[in-house]
């Protein structure tokens, strides 16, 4: 797609951003991923992930081209999330739902959960909410991907986000989860996290488990990747491979 056509499309955005996004998605097939930058982002840590192995075993994990979303659809998604949050906080709604749930559902962990996500799919009629995911994956993989984005032309460059994901904010979310849990969290800092999934090495997003392990370790938090069968509770503490676990990052 030439720059002149892209300029005409960007001029459409204020008046009809949905039509402009649709035209861009159908007409702009430029490759926007700088694979050298993506390789550097994935392989910078100890126990590095191989960019080549990742592409060989998971060829569709990263898309080479951008997806354009209209401002109107983003606003609609934000309003949907806000409405759901308001309804979920209503005492009458909570009692109605909990009446049909097992007793354990009444336990409040003190926080909504790290990476609680609302999963929207975009269709001809706009965004549709298909899932509320209490442990959505992909944050670190997307952070690596976003850093590797290169605009194919000036109009697209103006559409790209100015702020990049901050891994420090991700770590802060886990520390806040620990603080809200109460008990020992008031007396000592978060010391060890277990990243848990069934047969974790076989999971499609296993590379992200390793990225999170590296991130935690780099920020002074011991971390391990484990199957739930490796965890045990002695009445006082949660243990994995002989080590006390403070917090479970549940990826089940």
Enumerate the predicted regions with their spans.
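Preference for protein termini
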Residues: 1-252
């Amino acid at each position: 797609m030439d720059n002149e056509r892209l300029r005409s499309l960007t001029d459409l955005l204020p008046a009809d951003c949905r039509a402009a996004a649709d035209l861009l998605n159908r007409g702009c097939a430029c490759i926007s991923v700088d694979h050298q930058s993506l390789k550097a982002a994935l392989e910078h840590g100890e126990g590095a992930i191989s960019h080549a192995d990742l592409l060989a075993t998971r060829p569709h994990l990263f898309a080479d081209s951008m997806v354009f979303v209209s401002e109107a659809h983003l606003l609609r998604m934000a309003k949907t999330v806000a409405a759901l949050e308001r309804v979920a906080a209503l005492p009458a709604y909570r009692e109605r739902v909990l009446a049909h749930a097992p007793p354990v559902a009444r336990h409040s962990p003190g926080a909504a959960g790290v990476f609680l996500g609302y999963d929207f799919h975009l269709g001809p009629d706009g965004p549709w909410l298909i899932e509320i995911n209490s442990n959505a994956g992909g944050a670190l993989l997307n952070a690596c991907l976003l850093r590797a984005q290169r605009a194919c032309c000036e109009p697209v460059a103006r559409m790209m986000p100015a702020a990049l994901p901050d891994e420090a904010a991700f770590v802060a979310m886990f520390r806040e989860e620990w603080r809200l849990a109460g008990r020992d969290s008031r007396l000592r800092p978060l010391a060890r996290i277990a990243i848990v999934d069934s047969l974790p090495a076989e999971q499609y997003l296993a590379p992200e488990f390793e990225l999170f392990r590296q991130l935690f370790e780099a920020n002074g938090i011991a971390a391990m990747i484990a199957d739930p069968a490796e965890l045990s509770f002695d009445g006082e503490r949660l243990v994995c491979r002989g080590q006390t676990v403070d917090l479970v990052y549940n990826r089940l």
